A protein has these predicted regions:
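Extracytoplasmic
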Residues: 8-42
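Residue-level signature of mid-helix packing/kink "hotspots" within the transmembrane helices
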Residues: 25, 64-73, 158
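Extracellular/periplasmic helix-loop-helix junction of adjacent transmembrane segments
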Residues: 30-69
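Small-residue-mediated transmembrane helix hinge/kink sites in multi-pass secondary transporters
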Residues: 32, 73-77, 132
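Conserved MFS/SLC helix-loop-helix module at the cytosolic interface between two early adjacent transmembrane helices
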Residues: 70-106
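Intracellular juxtamembrane helix-capping segments at the cytosolic ends
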Residues: 124-138
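Glycine-rich segments within core transmembrane alpha-helices of 12-TM secondary carriers
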Residues: 141-159
C-alpha cells in the first residue's frame, strides 16, 4: 500500500536518472559537434586539432566522474539535514543549468565545469536523496526498487 502512495515520487526519481543517462549519451554521441561548438577545427580527422577536440569532449565527460567522486561523500549528510525533496529539486535545477551550459557554451573549459556540476547533481544531490527515497517508499523490496534506477539509466541508452 505504501508504494502505491509514493508511486509518483518513485517515478520522478526514475525519470531523473533517465535524464542522467541521456546526458552521458548525448555528450559521447555528439562529440564532433560539441568540439566544433567549442572552437576546435574538426574538418580533418587526421589533424591534431581534431584529436584535441575529441579530447576536450572526453575531458568534459571525465569531469562528470570527478564531480560524482567529490560530492558523494557529503551528499547523504546534506540530504539528512535539508531533506530529500529539496535535494532532488536542487539536482534537477543543476542539471538544467548543465544542459543549458553544454548547449550554449563556446568554451571547452565551461563545458568541463558543466560536466563537474552534472556529476555533483548526480551523486551529491540525486544519489544522496533518490536512493534512500526509493528504498523508503517501497520497503517490501527496497533492492528491487533500486534496480529500477539502474533500469532507467540503461533504458536511456536506447532512447
Amino acid at each position: 500500500m505504501r508504494a502505491k502512495k509514493y508511486l509518483w515520487s518513485i517515478l520522478c526519481v526514475y525519470f531523473c536518472y533517465l535524464t542522467h543517462g541521456i546526458q552521458a549519451i548525448i555528450l559521447s554521441q555528439n562529440n564532433v559537434n560539441f568540439a566544433k561548438q567549442w572552437g576546435f577545427n574538426m574538418t580533418d580527422p587526421q589533424s591534431a586539432a581534431y584529436a584535441a577536440g575529441l579530447a576536450a569532449v572526453s575531458t568534459a565527460v571525465a569531469w562528470t566522474g570527478f564531480g560524482k567522486f567529490v560530492s558523494v561523500w557529503i551528499g547523504g549528510e546534506i540530504s539528512d539535514h535539508v531533506g530529500r525533496k529539496k535535494l532532488m529539486i536542487g539536482g534537477a535545477a543543476l542539471y538544467i543549468l548543465c544542459f543549458l551550459g553544454f548547449l550554449f557554451t563556446k568554451s571547452a573549459l565551461v563545458a568541463s565545469v558543466c560536466g563537474f556540476v552534472s556529476g555533483v547533481a548526480t551523486s551529491g544531490f540525486w544519489d544522496a536523496s533518490g536512493y534512500p527515497a526509493v528504498q523508503e517508499a517501497y520497503p517490501v523490496a527496497p533492492g528491487s526498487a533500486l534496480s529500477g534506477i539502474k533500469f532507467f539509466v540503461s533504458v536511456s541508452g536506447m532512447v
